[in-house]
């Protein structure tokens, strides 16, 4: 029965998120008015989520070349980096923000599933998962609901799928109350000769859909992700996909076995925009690679979960756990047999053509006929450069009180209880971090997560990071710091930083101040990546992260989340974060100008982050990274932990108590600290960049100092590790003294209390 379709006109195009200029361009491309199905195809492919139309011009300024890169940014489903021994790492980070705002459990779960599919469609087996999460204040009951749903969704999907969740970060700021951020990262390993391209090539080659049946879930999910959240967004729960980790596990194993047959010519995940994006993007890559390509697909052959689905619905469905395969002609039955073995559907639905078009048949009629390149990023999709106007942060400078008027000991303990500082144990204990048995240390015991690479002596380090408060206060410095802190964490673990992926979360790009934040923070990221020789392999842009919750429309803090990988040539060089041995000397690398601007302490004590971010010296950061890796290779570092959120006091406290099986204490005396009235606050709580606290054997001090001098990194001994308890002095004057027990109680219980006992700590 023929589906009755609405009349296609400018008004209907506007309902699909297309402006008048874009609708006119579609008519010019086709030479006619589009069909309803074609309008739907253009609307999702030209959405911000798929086309990057407001961001691609800026993204092209990032460094995208490096000796170890095997694919360029955006060329495939994920970045691919050579790590030697005929092995490569595939890795990528993506957002699932809007779905998680309206349906936190499924939104987060399908975010995890989708990013893993991007990895194994390249032939790589996922070996690790990380995440980066942002929520509003834990005082808000809905925020607690969102946190619970997101954490359970990540944990349930990852645990069931069998990939360890080894790291991540979580922050709480009021600006995320109505618009949480859920960024998921997957890392996989593949032998060079087993990689697969997301390309449609070989005229006459059969095209197969494998995996789950197609339903009505997720229709216009890409469009939903390309608009502002509002109170009406709750009505868009049908745009949120529903995931099945057990189905994806079967799909993974079947796909890797199918690739091993040698009969898979091309492979693409069906993520945003489903069949539409996979057919369009694979066709366009075929044209780019060979000069011709295209796919003709018959929707009558697509396994449908629901009866009576229209061509529009089938093409735009974002049902999960599906992929598109181009098989070598004559071997499609071999591919189908592999999937049947794993009880996974595999059906031939079309063929590769050479006419450079995506053609869609339904009930014997041609319902879409579109030039493939007109649909995709880098082809005919629109590209815009928006107005960018800098705006001073809407925050006040802090009126600091002299040290003498403050109970700094009480404030230090209170700082440990802050949700942004306190242990995230309640979160990561819901994740299986040890499945696959490659995870080297428990979560949080190293500054970067590290897994062993089987069959080699190597280790793979990985980290996600971004302090969005810094980016809000100073987009250029904040973008640089996001990359620098990731690299610093990688180096603290003993690994050399290799490359990054990014997930750029911002507000509405049509607002000049938001586009300025985006453009300027990307510039900062690029500066840092060039300084560290860590090219960008790809990633994701998520605009329109604004909401009407809280009495007015407001954008989130600009949040360019960085995902980074690094390599340990010898896993025995791994360095942990925590103190290891009583009697060790405590050393501080780095000696920047200390100020409280942007710090968690300043927000807690003075109610404002101030008006600027910490300073950042990229050359010093690179020197520090090289020094840390050198010291790890020389087996001179017993531990290393970077100074970041909460400042030096929090770093020392974490080093003392983070290994719950072996807690130690410290005695530290900070000398030559000047005479300013705020010097103790600045020494203990400044988040000045480029600093790391390490521990070494006392007799190694000379060798370490000499190596630091060779690397042009300031270093000084500030104390020693003791069996228990802690004391901190500034210029010989006792300021703080703690028991191990009270540090532990403050740090480990606070977040769970805040989330479940309605206490904002």
Curated annotation (Swiss-Prot):
Positions of transmembrane segments: none
GO biological process: 'de novo' IMP biosynthetic process
Binding site for Mg(2+) 2: 118, 269
Enzyme class: ligase
Catalytic-site annotation from UniProt: 49, 96 (proton acceptor)
Pathway per the UniProt entry: Purine metabolism; IMP biosynthesis via de novo pathway; 5-amino-1-(5-phospho-D-ribosyl)imidazole from N(2)-formyl-N(1)-(5-phospho-D-ribosyl)glycinamide: step 1/2
GO cellular component terms, semicolon-separated: cytoplasm
Alphabetical keyword list: ATP-binding, Cytoplasm, Ligase, Magnesium, Metal-binding, Nucleotide-binding, Purine biosynthesis
GO molecular function: ATP binding; magnesium ion binding; phosphoribosylformylglycinamidine synthase activity
Pfam families per UniProt: AIRS, AIRS_C, FGAR-AT_linker
EC number(s) per entry: 6.3.5.3
Swiss-Prot/TrEMBL catalytic activity: N(2)-formyl-N(1)-(5-phospho-beta-D-ribosyl)glycinamide + L-glutamine + ATP + H2O = 2-formamido-N(1)-(5-O-phospho-beta-D-ribosyl)acetamidine + L-glutamate + ADP + phosphate + H(+)
Residues binding Mg(2+) 1, per UniProt: 94, 540
Binding residues annotated for substrate, in chain numbering: 95-98, 117, 241, 318-320, 542
Location of the protein in the cell: Cytoplasm
Major localisation: cytoplasm
Gene3D superfamilies the UniProt entry points to: PurM-like C-terminal domain, PurM-like, N-terminal domain
InterPro entries, per database record: PRibForGlyAmidine_synth_PurL (IPR010074), PurL_linker (IPR041609), PurM-like_C_dom (IPR010918), PurM-like_C_sf (IPR036676), PurM-like_N (IPR016188), PurM-like_N_sf (IPR036921)
Family the entry assigns: Belongs to the FGAMS family.
PANTHER family tied to this protein: PHOSPHORIBOSYLFORMYLGLYCINAMIDINE SYNTHASE SUBUNIT PURL (PTHR43555:SF1)
Function: Part of the phosphoribosylformylglycinamidine synthase complex involved in the purines biosynthetic pathway. Catalyzes the ATP-dependent conversion of formylglycinamide ribonucleotide (FGAR) and glutamine to yield formylglycinamidine ribonucleotide (FGAM) and glutamate. The FGAM synthase complex is composed of three subunits. PurQ produces an ammonia molecule by converting glutamine to glutamate. PurL transfers the ammonia molecule to FGAR to form FGAM in an ATP-dependent manner.
Full protein name: Phosphoribosylformylglycinamidine synthase subunit PurL
